[in-house]
């Protein structure tokens, strides 16, 4: 079995860890970063992922996709998607089944497909670090993700060429990293406020057991919303001062987004920052510059209600866990937004204790995912992880009522069955409408799927016995079956994301991703071949220049011809042709190198001979200089 990597597939940034022996290790990207922006950019020639995609977003806003996680498993007409559309520079459209897709230059991409592009980059970075192929991963999701969102995440992994061994909740992964090697029993709260989602989980950690007691959250609350508040403020201030509305200028909005994100980070450590964006726009009077000072107090006022929205889920999670805030031993902060002083203060006020800041909030989730990978691979022993399902599961029954079979915060994996009957005489079939949610009426909850149990023998209403069974696996993904106990006839459904991809679509996307990986590999080979050729041309031309007229005309012409042939090959895209022309010039340039070496040797010998001649003359002069005229007196006896 190869290495199982742990991936935190984040809204804003993603991170990948691996177990090296018993220690989790962060895999840095080629740019040297420990996290990679979850951004994909499409240009005329190529597809960009990560830092390079984020850097070109200002000049290419309509074709740069960020925060795609917010669209995972959602319908295009969902209220949250409608809100996101208002601020998104890229186009969000309805895909098959009415699910939310993004459209780039006429091509529709599912959120799973775009996420797969980010995962493929993380996979490639891990392979470059390990020097071996990576095929298995543990991927994290927000604890409050529903079944559709979990299934979409798993599909993204498959498209990227990864066998997703486990989908694990982000707060659970964080607690696994926090509780790793800890023996003392503690009740901990993991407060996870990231780029796009918020989760709160109450867990018991200790003696190598991590048990989730309860979880709650908001899958549409995070740093992106905080950034948007700052952007709105900057747009309004600029409009007030200059009478120009920047909200209609997508390029300006992208610059404002970058500035808002930076200002928000700066104000976690400073009391005031200046946002300075020269040439943000222009009118008939000339270019306009944006210069606005933003204080921490002003930022806190802008986002106070967003921070307040995190408190109610905390109350619900504690209630479900049967604990009071004072019974929680530690509050662990996860997600970049928890660096904000106002967030830390709200958490401290609610739980009555200072939060634990010992873990890196950007990396702790992927670290936990890698530990889970180590557990699955058998490299990490004696660690038991007990997770829960975040939302209640059930079916629609007579009168449009939602009948729960599995309550929220039930430990998974789990299986539960309940017997139902028919509502009419001689009813030949029953429709099973599978749902997830907490509302009493079916219409207010989320549909996971529908299926029919047919062939029920004619009988008065209330007589047939239909057993409905729910089975949730360790990934939190649902299977449902219905069985007529009278005939033994059974029908089952594996719930795939109702707004997700069919098996055929996934297989096609897997093939497309593999083809794209081959294209990327060929592109890399072409760049490397051109670089090698360019380097050889430079050294060859320099050697020709150094030798000047001392080179035979035939050899000089041969080298010049082969150099020209290589330059022509470099203009094309045939890697083999470039390599062949490079080899031919390399062989010819060996003769050139020999000539140059011989010239240098001759020069060195000439210099040595001249030095030797000078030495002899010097020695003679030196001897002559040693002769001294002396006065003397002749003594006679």
Swiss-Prot record:
<keyword id="KW-0067">ATP-binding</keyword>
<dbReference type="InterPro" id="IPR018181">
    <property type="entry name" value="Heat_shock_70_CS"/>
</dbReference>
<dbReference type="GO" id="GO:0140662">
    <property type="term" value="F:ATP-dependent protein folding chaperone"/>
</dbReference>
<keyword id="KW-0346">Stress response</keyword>
<keyword id="KW-0547">Nucleotide-binding</keyword>
<dbReference type="GO" id="GO:0005524">
    <property type="term" value="F:ATP binding"/>
</dbReference>
<comment type="function">
    <text>Acts as a chaperone.</text>
</comment>
<dbReference type="InterPro" id="IPR029048">
    <property type="entry name" value="HSP70_C_sf"/>
</dbReference>
<protein>
    <recommendedName>
        <fullName>Chaperone protein DnaK</fullName>
    </recommendedName>
</protein>
<comment type="similarity">
    <text>Belongs to the heat shock protein 70 family.</text>
</comment>
<dbReference type="InterPro" id="IPR043129">
    <property type="entry name" value="ATPase_NBD"/>
</dbReference>
<feature type="region of interest" description="Disordered">
    <location>
        <begin position="600"/>
        <end position="637"/>
    </location>
</feature>
<keyword id="KW-0597">Phosphoprotein</keyword>
<feature type="compositionally biased region" description="Low complexity">
    <location>
        <begin position="600"/>
        <end position="621"/>
    </location>
</feature>
<dbReference type="InterPro" id="IPR013126">
    <property type="entry name" value="Hsp_70_fam"/>
</dbReference>
<dbReference type="GO" id="GO:0051082">
    <property type="term" value="F:unfolded protein binding"/>
</dbReference>
<dbReference type="InterPro" id="IPR029047">
    <property type="entry name" value="HSP70_peptide-bd_sf"/>
</dbReference>
<feature type="compositionally biased region" description="Acidic residues">
    <location>
        <begin position="624"/>
        <end position="637"/>
    </location>
</feature>
<dbReference type="Pfam" id="PF00012">
    <property type="entry name" value="HSP70"/>
</dbReference>
<feature type="modified residue" description="Phosphothreonine; by autocatalysis">
    <location>
        <position position="197"/>
    </location>
</feature>
<keyword id="KW-0143">Chaperone</keyword>
<dbReference type="InterPro" id="IPR012725">
    <property type="entry name" value="Chaperone_DnaK"/>
</dbReference>
């Amino acid at each position: 079995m190869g290495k199982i990597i742990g991936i935190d597939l984040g809204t804003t940034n993603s991170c990948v860890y691996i177990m090296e022996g018993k220690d989790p290790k962060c895999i840095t990207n080629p740019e040297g970063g420990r996290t990679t922006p979850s951004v994909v950019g499409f240009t005329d020639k190529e597809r960009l992922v990560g830092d390079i995609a984020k850097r070109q977003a200002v000049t290419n806003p309509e074709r740069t996709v960020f925060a795609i996680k917010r669209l995972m498993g959602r319908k295009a007409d969902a209220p949250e998607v409608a809100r996101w559309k208002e601020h998104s520079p890229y186009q969000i459209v309805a895909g098959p089944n009415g699910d939310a897709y993004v459209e780039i230059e006429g091509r529709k991409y599912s959120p799973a497909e775009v996420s797969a592009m980010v995962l493929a980059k993380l996979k490639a970075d891990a392979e470059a670090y390990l020097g071996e192929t990576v095929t298995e991963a543990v991927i994290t999701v927000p604890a409050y993700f529903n079944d559709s969102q979990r299934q979409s995440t798993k599909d993204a992994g498959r498209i990227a060429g990864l066998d997703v061994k486990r989908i694990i909740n982000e707060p659970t992964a964080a607690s696994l990293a926090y509780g790793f090697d800890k023996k003392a029993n503690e009740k901990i709260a993991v407060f996870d406020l990231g780029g796009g989602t918020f989760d709160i989980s109450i867990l018991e950690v200790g003696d190598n057991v991590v048990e989730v007691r309860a979880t709650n959250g908001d899958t549409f609350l995070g740093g992106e919303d905080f950034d948007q508040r700052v952007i709105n403020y900057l747009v309004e201030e600029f409009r007030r001062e200059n009478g120009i509305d920047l909200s209609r200028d997508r390029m300006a909005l992208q610059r404002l987004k970058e500035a808002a994100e930076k200002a928000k980070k700066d104000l976690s450590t400073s009391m005031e920052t200046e946002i300075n964006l020269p040439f943000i726009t222009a009118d008939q009077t000339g270019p306009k510059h944006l210069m606005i000072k933003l204080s921490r107090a002003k930022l806190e006022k802008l986002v106070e209600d967003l921070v307040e929205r995190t408190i109610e889920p905390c109350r619900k999670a504690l209630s479900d866990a049967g604990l009071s805030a004072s019974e929680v031993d530690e509050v662990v902060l996860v997600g970049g937004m928890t660096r904000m002083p106002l967030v830390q203060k709200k958490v401290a006020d609610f739980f009555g204790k200072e939060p634990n800041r010992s873990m890196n909030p950007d990396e702790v989730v992927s670290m936990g995912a890698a530990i889970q990978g180590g557990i699955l691979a058998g490299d990490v022993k004696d660690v038991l992880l007990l997770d829960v399902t975040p939302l209640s599961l059930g079916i629609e029954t007579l009168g449009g009522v939602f009948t729960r079979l599995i309550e929220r915060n039930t430990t998974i994996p789990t299986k539960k069955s309940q017997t139902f009957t028919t509502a009419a005489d001689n009813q030949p079939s029953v429709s099973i409408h599978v749902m997830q949610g907490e509302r009493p009426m079916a219409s207010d909850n989320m549909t996971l799927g529908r299926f029919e149990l047919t062939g029920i023998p004619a009988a008065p209403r209330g007589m047939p016995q239909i057993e409905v069974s729910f089975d949730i696996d360790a990934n939190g993904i649902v299977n449902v079956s219905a069985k007529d106990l009278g005939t033994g006839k059974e029908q089952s459904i594996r719930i795939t994301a109702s707004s997700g991809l069919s098996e055929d679509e996934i297989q096609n996307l897997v093939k497309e991703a593999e083809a794209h990986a081959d294209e990327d590999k060929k592109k890399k080979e072409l760049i490397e071949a051109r670089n090698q050729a360019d380097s050889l041309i430079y050294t060859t031309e320099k050697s020709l220049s150094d030798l000047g007229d001392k080179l035979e005309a035939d050899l000089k012409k041969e080298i010049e011809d082969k150099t020209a042939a290589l330059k022509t090959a470099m203009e094309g895209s045939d890697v083999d042709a470039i390599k062949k022309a490079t080899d031919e010039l390399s062989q010819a340039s060996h003769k050139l190198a020999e000539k140059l070496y011989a010239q240098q040797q001759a020069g060195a010998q000439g210099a040595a001979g001249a030095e030797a001649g000078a030495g002899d003359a010097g020695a003679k002069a030196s001897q002559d200089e040693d002769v001294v005229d002396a006065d003397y007196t002749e003594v006679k006896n």
